[in-house]
Every structure is written in C-alpha cells, then in structure tokens.
Curated annotation (Swiss-Prot):
GO biological process, alphabetically ordered: cell division; establishment of mitotic spindle orientation; microtubule organizing center organization; microtubule sliding; nuclear migration; nuclear migration along microtubule; vesicle transport along microtubule
GO cellular component, one term: kinetochore
Subunit structure: Self-associates. Interacts with NDL1 and dynein.
Family: Belongs to the WD repeat LIS1/nudF family.
Protein name: Nuclear distribution protein PAC1
Domain of life according to the entry: Eukaryota
GO MF, one annotated term: identical protein binding
Keywords assigned: Cell cycle, Cell division, Coiled coil, Cytoplasm, Cytoskeleton, Microtubule, Mitosis, Repeat, Transport, WD repeat
Residue ranges the record marks as coiled coil: 64-93
Start and stop residues of the WD repeats: 118-157, 161-203, 209-252, 254-292, 318-362, 382-421, 423-461
Length: 461
C-alpha cells in the first residue's frame, strides 16, 4: 500500500533529524537511537546536530510554537463567533419588524466598548445629559468632568466640586431649558450646579445640614417647584427647595447609614446599612412598609414607575415587561408605582412588589397592618461579589459588581441574557444608560460604566 505524506521530502527529513536530536539529548539508550536512525534512513553524521550546525532543541521549540498558534486560533475563532452573533442581531435589535424606534428599547451593548475615557481617579458616578451627547463623571478626588462623546480628545469642562470624594450625581432639565446638576460628597455637603451654554459648571447652591457623608441625591418636580432629596450616613433623609436652598423636611427612616434613595411623587424608597429597604411618605415622614431579605448593606434601589392611565399604547407596549411591571393599576394610582428593585453586598438583586398603604382622606397615608413587608417577586443570582449599581431599560436590567463584570437580565423571565465578564480591570462602581422612553426623539443607544481604576467604558451603536 502506498503511503501519502502530508509533509514534503525536505520537511520530513528535518523532522526526522530533529526527533533523533531530541531523543539523544534526553539521554536515551544507544540502541533506541540506532533504531531510529535505521527507521528514518539516517547516518550517524546526519544525526550529529553540532557538526551540521543544527539547533538540537528545534523539535521542542516547534512543538511549543504549534501549541501557542493553536491557542491563538481558538481565541480568534471565539471572537469571530461573538462578532458574527452581534452582527446578526443588529437588524432585529435596531429596527425590529416595524422600523426603528419600536424595538430600540431591547438594545443590548456589544461585547467590547466603543471607546474608553480615562479621568485618572476612581469613577464614583456617571450621568448622561438628557438631550445632548454629553456624559458627566464624578470622581473620588472631588472632581466632576463633562465629556462630549463625539469629541472626547479633551473634556468639555472640569471642576473641583468638593474637597473630598463625590458620592453621587443627579441631573434634571429646568423649565428654562438649562441643566441642573446635583453633587453629593464625603465632605458633608450637597451642591447644585448649572451646566451653562458655554459648557461650564456654575455653582448655584450649597446645601449644608447633614452631619456625616451625603450618600445620594435625587431631583423631584412638585408642581412648579423643583425639590431635591438627599440621604446621609447621619441616618436622615432631607428634602430641599432648590430655589431657596431651605430644608423643608427631614426624617429618619433607618437606624443605620442611609446609602441610597429613589423618589416618586410624595413617596421615597430608601436602602440602608441595616440591610432593609423602606417605603416612606416624605411629606409626613411616615414609614409605610419595608423589605427584609438581604443580609448585607443595600447599595442601590430603583423604582419602576407605572405608565399613566392616559398614556397612549404603542407597539412597544406589547412587550411583557410593559404589560406587567409598568401597566396602569388603579389601586396603585395614588402611589404611582408597584414594583422596585434592590441590589446589595450579598451579591443579590431582588425585584419586589410593594404593598399598598392605607389611604385615608385628608390624612397622610398609614401603614397597612395586614401587609407591612414587600413581596419578593424574583431574585437575580449570578454575581460573585458586591452588586454596586443597577439600571433598567425596557425589559432589560443591567447590573455591575465588584467581581468586575456587568450583566444584562430579562426582567420577565429572570434569565441572564448577556455577561461582560472582564468589563474592567477594577471594581465597577456605577452604570448609566440612556432613556428607554419610546417617544424619545433621540432614540439614543448609549451605555456607560465607571470603575475604580479611573476608566469609563462607553458602549454605543
């Protein structure tokens, strides 16, 4: 039977000589070496690497290089497969069946960031401008930096907002079209800034009343007034009038550090170091209900507001998450929301259904003694360290963690849809994602993450 060789004659000869060299260097018996020479048809002079000026370690080097090349081929094939999957998903995600603007809320970022911003210090919070391609980054050195995402060679503006680290940012468009920015800090202060037309920060108010670290702030529009709520390590939540700078309400919802809050109308949800989440009526300070399941401090809470009963139904509303978590419920209309989400240092994210308080005419709402605890709807498990931030966009829930990963979850099924396993070289502190409002004329698809290594990853379509 004829033999078919893959290698040509000269390469076979080199391989045979290299095998003999390797066996000799390994100290094999002379009989084995002689047998190999006879098998390969080589003389003793041909197998002498020193005499022929041949590298005696050639076989070992070739073998190692083949392994490295094979590993590189596997990595490239995996990357090619990921890019192919993303490319195939673009038409359905971006345009859907009925054209662009219907399914854009289902967009998920690609595997690799479009570009990266470096601010040189730990990024503690990120916010997007509501209508312009501008990102505001807060750092642990007290700076706030504004970047134009389409011209990122230099920051638009940077200011030393606080003497110590900035803990959070909040943005709100004022009635006159200007942009208001709130910064909270470890220096016990909260400041309100105006981002002017010439891309500069102008200080409007300094709010000083907290006696410890100010953790987070949140704007609230109440009629013609614009209010700001803050929470602090001094155990209090305070509500401020942004025009006068007066504190109009202060109350204590927890007995430990209040780390996070979210407002909707007259109601506020807070999360604390005591591992509980509480619903309060802030004008009266009444505590209404609470959630007890987490075992470690709460890092972030989010309210999922209901759609107004008068809101027109769009094709995007056919999505299950719109029908379930955002649909109008007349019983909850005084509250304005039915569900909230929390994340904690116990590595868990929990979706909660909020019990209805007792609504009494001409009196503040009271706790419902028959149901004082939130109802657990779903627990999202997957992170292996503290979950630091969460954001909701359509039916997608995004989360970041100290395990250096970002995850995208389906709010309806609880399934983890996508994982960015090494999204950063350091702990990921914060996320920011553009609006998921279906009538948003911008239809932006932006996603940002900030980490302790001073990098901000920007994902865009």
């Amino acid at each position: 039977m004829s033999q078919h060789h893959i290698l040509p004659q000269h390469q076979r000869a080199d391989l045979n000589r290299s095998i003999c060299d390797y066996v000799q260097r390994c100290g094999a018996e002379e009989s084995l070496v002689v047998g190999l020479r006879q098998l390969f048809g080589l003389s003793a002079e041909e197998c002498d690497a020193t005499r022929n000026g041949r590298d005696p370690d050639l076989l070992l080097k070739k073998w190692n290089s083949i392994i490295r090349l094979h590993r590189k081929i596997l990595d490239l094939e995996q990357k090619c497969q990921q890019l192919t999957e993303e490319l195939e998903a673009v038409p359905t995600e971006a345009y859907g069946k009925a054209g662009r603007g219907v399914s854009h809320v289902l967009w998920t970022p690609r595997s690799n960031p479009t570009f990266q911003l470096d601010v040189g210090a730990s990024v503690t919070d990120i916010k997007l401008h509501p209508s312009l391609p501008i990102a505001f980054l807060a750092t642990d050195q007290g700076k706030v930096v504004a970047y134009d995402l389409f011209n990122r060679s230099m920051p638009l503006h940077s200011t030393q907002a606080h003497m110590k680290g900035v803990t959070s940012l909040a943005v709100m468009e004022a009635e006159n079209g200007s942009l208001l920015i709130s910064t909270t800090s470890k220096d016990l202060q909260c400041k309100i800034w105006s981002f002017t037309d010439n891309a500069a920060f102008q200080l409007l108010r300094t709010l000083s009343s907290h006696e410890h670290i100010v953790s987070q702030s949140c704007f609230l529009r109440s009629g013609s007034d614009l209010l700001l709520a803050t929470c602090s390590r001094d155990l209090t939540v305070k509500v401020w009038d942004t025009k006068s700078g007066w504190c109009i309400k202060s109350f204590q919802p927890h007995n430990q550090w209040v780390r996070t809050l979210e407002l909707h109308g007259d109601y506020v949800i807070t999360g604390s170091n005591d591992a509980t989440i509480r619903l309060s009526h802030w004008p009266s300070g009444n505590g209404l209900s609470m959630a007890v399941m987490h075992e470690f401090p709460i890092e972030r809470v989010l309210i999922i507001p209901m759609r107004a009963n008068t809101a027109q139904k769009t094709e995007a509303d056919d999505d299950q998450v719109e029908l379930e978590y955002r649909k109008y419920d007349p019983d909850y209309s005084p509250l304005g929301f039915k569900y909230c989400i929390s994340c904690s240092r116990d590595n868990l994210i929990v979706l909660w259904k909020i019990p209805l308080p007792k609504f009494i005419p001409h009196r503040p709402p009271q706790p419902n003694l028959l149901q004082t605890n939130f109802e657990k709807v779903h627990v999202f498990k997957g992170h292996t360290s503290w979950v630091r931030d969460i954001k909701v966009r359509g039916r997608h829930l995004f989360s970041c963690s100290d395990d250096r990963s970002i995850r995208c979850w389906d709010l309806v099924t609880g399934q983890c849809l996508k994982v960015w396993p090494e999204a950063s070289h350091g702990f990921i502190n914060c996320l920011s994602v553009d609006s998921d409002v279906s009538n948003d004329k911008l239809l932006r698809e932006l996603f940002l993450s900030g980490s302790i290594d001073g990098k901000c990853n920007v994902f865009m379509r």
